[in-house]
């Protein structure tokens, strides 16, 4: 009988531990998962220029100007480059292309190729930029140039896209949205020219990937 009581007590302790510790472990795991999600996202604002940013952030004019100028430099380095003005205009529309500085990320051999064909190479104008909130406990802020097309035939038509072709919705400044922190990371420098329609293809592919990822996430959350 003593042995039976001992076995029952051990079994009771084991079952009690399983019943009571499992929910605690799940709760702790959930907290860490939520914390991980919070750390992986960042709230950003979309502006067309430094004036828009300054109007939305009174007293932060200097920071807005710095972010805008940094975004312009990043655009020169990472924007899609075209050998001819016609190729750029076909992708982005009339009035949205400019000659790119010779040092704007291009490899010397590609600079020479572009200069032989048209005297220069071309890139889209920066249509706007994303900027992290002007808070953060001294951590500073980041910015990311955005591009947009006025050509209805382009997948980038009326949308804000980054240099990789990722779509951030309608090209409407003044919006605030949540993006992965990776969205604000510096993009690779453009080292080759893009063929006509090439950037639009990148936008289309990125949009397909984004829709697929959203669908997978929704199914996972729905069980």
UniProtKB/Swiss-Prot annotation:
UniProt region (Disordered), positions on chain: 178-223
The organism's place on the tree of life at top rank: Bacteria
UniProt biased composition (Polar residues): 204-223
Record field: compositional bias (Low complexity): 178-195
Family: Belongs to the UPF0441 family.
Protein name: UPF0441 protein YgiB
Species per Swiss-Prot/TrEMBL record: Shigella dysenteriae serotype 1 (strain Sd197)
Protein encoded by which gene: ygiB
